[in-house]
């Protein structure tokens, strides 16, 4: 079974937080190109910035037949999948068909966690919504470790921010 990561999971240090029982190595994060999806800033998570609760906006994916995205796939066990489901409880677990993966021949489909619940999808102009600058840094740091084509695929989301960026340390509330 493979997990597809399209945001902070492209950063090995961040991904390691999801895998407490094994040490991830660089080669565990396999770059993949997937047809039929695009990356968007619209996933709401309640976060705390210096004692202030706000809606943090994080990366999400959505279906788009005319697009493709890069991300990483990580081979996971059934036990790791169960732990991930708990950690990603606000997300829907979706299946990405192995045929959608352009640059790898796979035996299995991939799973991914994406926001699909209406109340967890941010609308442009919605109040009290901020993209944490630290999250942007985490994703950018991870992207640096991959090919130019991989990096270029993230270019658009790093230049068009639909919500205000908020500096500082945050925690999930």
Range-by-range predicted roles:
Residues 1-173:
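A glycine-rich, hydrophobic/aromatic-adjacent loop/helix-cap motif
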């Amino acid at each position: 079974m493979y997990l597809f990561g399209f945001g902070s999971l492209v950063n090995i240090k961040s991904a390691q937080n999801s895998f407490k029982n094994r040490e991830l190595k660089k080669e565990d994060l396999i770059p993949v190109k997937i047809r039929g999806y695009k990356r968007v800033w619209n996933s709401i998570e309640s976060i705390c910035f210096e004692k202030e609760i706000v809606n943090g906006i994080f990366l999400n994916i959505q279906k788009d037949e005319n697009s493709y995205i890069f991300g990483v796939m990580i081979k996971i066990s059934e036990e790791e999948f169960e732990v991930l489901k708990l950690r990603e409880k606000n997300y829907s677990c979706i299946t990405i068909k192995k045929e959608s993966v352009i640059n790898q021949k796979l035996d299995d489909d991939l799973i991914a966690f994406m926001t699909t619940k209406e109340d967890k999808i941010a609308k442009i102009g919605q109040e009290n919504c901020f993209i944490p600058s630290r999250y942007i840094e985490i994703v950018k740091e991870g992207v640096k470790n991959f090919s130019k084509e991989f990096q270029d695929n993230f270019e658009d989301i790093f230049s068009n921010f639909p919500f205000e960026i908020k500096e500082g340390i945050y925690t999930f509330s």
